[in-house]
Regions:
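Short, well-ordered loop/turn sites that connect or cap secondary structure elements
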Residues: 80-82
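Short, solvent-exposed secondary-structure boundary/capping segments
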Residues: 105-120
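Compositionally biased, charged N-terminal/linker segments
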Residues: 1-73
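Glycine- and charge-enriched low-complexity intrinsically disordered segments
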Residues: 119-141
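Short beta-strand-centered aromatic/proline hotspots
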Residues: 94-107
Length: 141
C-alpha cells in the first residue's frame, strides 16, 4: 500500500529547488552531523529515546515538544517512509510537487539537509487547498 507524506524541505521549503534538481528529500535533523544508518530503529519511541538527550545538549533552549517534533520528522524521513511511498512538498510558488521515494536513507556530509532519501520527482503538481478541504484528489499531470 502506498502512503503519502507532506514534507517541508527547510523553512518554507527553501531547499526544494536543490532537492528537486538532486532527486532527493532530506532533513537537517537538529545539527546531528553524522551518518545515523546504524542507529535507525524500527519504532519512533526507541529512536526518540536515543536522540533526545543529544538534541537537548545541542539545543538547550528548545522545548522537549519542539525537539520531539524534530526527532519525529527525522525518523519519518530516514526510516518510516518506504520505497514507493509518495511525498508532497510545497515548491515555493503555491503548488505542491509530488515525488516517489526510490531508495533507502543516505547521508551527505556538509550538505544542506544531509539526512536524505532518493526521490523521483513526478510530472505532477497539486494546488494548495485550505486545510479543511485538503485531499490528494486534486493532483493532475
Amino acid at each position: 500500500m502506498t502512503n503519502y507524506y507532506r514534507i517541508m524541505l527547510g523553512k518554507k521549503s527553501a531547499h526544494f529547488p536543490e532537492c528537486s534538481a538532486g532527486g532527493y528529500i532530506g532533513s537537517g535533523f537538529g545539527d546531528i552531523v553524522r551518518d545515523v544508518s546504524g542507529e535507525l530503529t524500527e519504532d519512533f519511541r526507541s529512536f526518540s529515546q536515543r536522540f533526545m538527550p543529544e538534541m537537548q545538549t545541542l539545543h538547550p533552549g528548545k522545548s522537549k515538544i519542539a525537539l520531539g517534533l524534530w526527532c519525529g520528522f527525522a525518523w519519518t524521513i530516514c526510516k518510516n517512509i518506504r520505497v514507493g511511498d509518495l511525498v508532497l512538498c510545497p515548491d515555493g510558488s503555491g503548488n505542491y510537487q509530488v515525488g516517489e521515494v526510490t531508495g533507502p536513507y543516505f547521508y551527505v556530509a556538509g550538505g544542506n539537509l544531509p539526512h536524505r532519501r532518493p526521490v523521483r520527482w513526478l510530472d505532477r503538481t497539486g494546488k494548495r487547498l485550505p486545510r479543511r478541504e485538503s485531499s490528494f484528489g486534486n493532483l493532475h499531470p
